[in-house]
Amino acid sequence: ETIGLAVSLELPLLVVAIQRGGPSTGLPTKTEQADLLQAMFGRNGEAPVPIVAPCTPADCFDAALEAARIALTYRTPVFLLSDGYLANGSEPWRIPETEELPDLRVR
């Protein structure tokens, strides 16, 4: 209900959901994307929201910037979905300089 309210109020909001491992009897054997349907359809009435999902650990930073850009530009909540593999993964990645970051100001 809160996300649907944010859609109707046109609040730019970034919701980050790190999905946990699947069902198991101890240590999960695989990750799940169980929150995808909830993110897509889990609101009352017609309140569609964009969903951004990174594919690599290094892509998470760019995906977060893109989700923030969409939220600010279109004044809507945006879901940023990730999973356990990405949350615990690592790879070489260069932190960009401040001047290299995109301008997120709304004009």
Predicted regions and their residues:
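Thiamine diphosphate
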Residues: 1-39, 50-71
